[in-house]
Regions:
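Gly/Thr-rich phosphate-binding beta-strand-loop-beta motif of the actin/hexokinase/Hsp70
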Residues: 106-136, 151
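Active-site proximal loops enriched in glycine and acidic residues that flank catalytic Cys/His/Asp
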Residues: 128-130, 138-139, 211, 226-227
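Conserved ATP-utilizing enzyme core subdomain
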Residues: 142, 149-179
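A general structural motif
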Residues: 199-208
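Glycine-rich beta-strand-to-loop/alpha-helix junction loops that act as flexible
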Residues: 220-229
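Short glycine-rich, Thr/Ser-proximal phosphate-binding strand/loop in the N-terminal lobe
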Residues: 1-3, 133-151, 155
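Residue-level signature of catalytic and energy-coupling elements of molecular machines
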Residues: 83, 118, 151, 207, ...
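Nucleotide/phosphate-binding catalytic cleft detector across ATP-hydrolyzing
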Residues: 1-114, 144, 171-194, 214-221
Length: 232
């Protein structure tokens, strides 16, 4: 028999994705449309034996498992509309944690049980890999904005000022700002960090909980990306 090539493997993956799409359309509301925005093969089987890749192998019975992500059509349409207004065309689309993990964690390191967390402004996107494959994605709805809002309340400043203070915290021993009363103040970075202990701990706890949920327990290591990851 002929050895398995890229085309046959892609066909197998496409079948798995099509099955996922069929299951989603069957279980979801009839009026809701979803679009595939990314998928990652998590495991292959050749004649019922698990493999990380089928390329170059021969066998009779092939199976593939994938993690496929679908977004509501309204979200995808909005993204395309923004690109069109900017005079650009969409060549491909993927999820932030997929892109971040592919960029930050080499394929040979994905044999380890690792998690990558991209802490942005509004959400913290999480991807988990083990045994050579990406095995799951999830998202925590807490991120850098929670820290900014905590600074607003603690120091009586507006959002842009709090955002600038947050950025300065990682670079300086003291932070100067003007509060909403027009008073100029300078506080030691350590004092500001003490004010943020609660929100930072809550952010860390939520992310840790999400990682353990999608991974089934603590991973061997966690990689951090995004601006929010610069917080201590």
């Amino acid at each position: 028999p002929e050895a398995l090539g890229h085309e046959r493997i892609h066909q197998l993956e496409a079948t798995a994705v099509a099955n996922a799409e069929q299951a989603l359309s069957t279980d979801g509301p009839e009026e809701q449309r979803f679009f595939l925005v990314g998928y990652t093969p998590t495991q292959f089987w050749l004649d019922h034996y698990p493999l990380t890749t089928l390329l170059g192998h021969t066998g009779q019975h092939l199976e593939a498992a994938v993690v496929a992500t679908f977004l509501p059509s309204e979200v995808v349409d909005s993204l395309y509309a923004v690109m069109q207004k900017a005079g650009l065309e969409v060549a491909s689309m993927t999820l932030e944690p997929i892109a971040a993990l592919n960029a930050a964690i080499p394929a040979d390191l994905r044999l380890l049980n690792l998690a990558l967390v991209d802490i942005g402004a509004g959400t913290s996107d999480i991807a988990v890999c083990r045994d050579g494959s990406v095995v799951g994605y999830t998202m925590a709805t807490v991120a850098g904005d929670e820290i900014t809002e905590a600074l607003m309340r603690a120091c009586l400043v507006d959002f842009p000022t709090a955002e600038a203070m947050k950025l300065e915290l990682g670079r300086s021993k003291s932070v100067s700002f003007t509060d909403i009363l027009g008073l100029e103040q300078t506080l030691p970075a350590e004092e500001l960090f003490s004010l943020l202990d609660g929100p930072i701990q809550a952010l860390a706890d939520e992310i840790a909980q999400r990682i353990c949920q999608v991974n089934g327990g603590p991973p061997s290591a966690v990689f951090l990306a995004g601006g929010g990851s610069k917080l201590p």
